[in-house]
Amino acid sequence: MSQIQTLHSLLEPTVTGLGYELVGVELTGAKGNRTLRVYIDTPAGIRLEDCEAVSHQVSGLLDVEDPIEGAYNLEVSSPGLDRPIFKSADYDRFSGERIKLRLLELYEGRRRVKGVLLGLDGEFVRVRDVDGVELRIPLELIDRARLDLEP
């Protein structure tokens, strides 16, 4: 299990117990200067007070469990309008929306793809790129995915 998966599994019961969806978790930066981002959401959206409540509970849990070596900053926020895509089900949930992908390696000559998300087809994400070409990108090649606000 990766460190991100471990963190997600550790945090999800606390976040859902508070009445929020744990959208995803990111751990960025180098050792000693890391940031743990915890994205939460509800159907009604997220307010500052929601982030504070989750931050307080998650911070206590992380202090006890100590799953991250060294110092780090904790950030709790809504996923925002340019929402990151963490879960396979979100590729169907946001079908029809504009998306941008960063790939782990070249796929059909590119590492970045922008276009309209067409959904998930088994282990492939379907995207109609800006040139109108439909791509089937293996899920395992996607490093990062976000909804795209740019027209």
Curated annotation (Swiss-Prot):
<dbReference type="InterPro" id="IPR003728">
    <property type="entry name" value="Ribosome_maturation_RimP"/>
</dbReference>
<protein>
    <recommendedName>
        <fullName>Ribosome maturation factor RimP</fullName>
    </recommendedName>
</protein>
<dbReference type="GO" id="GO:0000028">
    <property type="term" value="P:ribosomal small subunit assembly"/>
</dbReference>
<keyword id="KW-0963">Cytoplasm</keyword>
<dbReference type="GO" id="GO:0006412">
    <property type="term" value="P:translation"/>
</dbReference>
<dbReference type="Pfam" id="PF17384">
    <property type="entry name" value="DUF150_C"/>
</dbReference>
<dbReference type="InterPro" id="IPR036847">
    <property type="entry name" value="RimP_C_sf"/>
</dbReference>
<dbReference type="InterPro" id="IPR028998">
    <property type="entry name" value="RimP_C"/>
</dbReference>
<dbReference type="InterPro" id="IPR028989">
    <property type="entry name" value="RimP_N"/>
</dbReference>
<dbReference type="Pfam" id="PF02576">
    <property type="entry name" value="RimP_N"/>
</dbReference>
<comment type="function">
    <text>Required for maturation of 30S ribosomal subunits.</text>
</comment>
<dbReference type="InterPro" id="IPR035956">
    <property type="entry name" value="RimP_N_sf"/>
</dbReference>
<comment type="similarity">
    <text>Belongs to the RimP family.</text>
</comment>
<dbReference type="GO" id="GO:0005829">
    <property type="term" value="C:cytosol"/>
</dbReference>
<keyword id="KW-0690">Ribosome biogenesis</keyword>
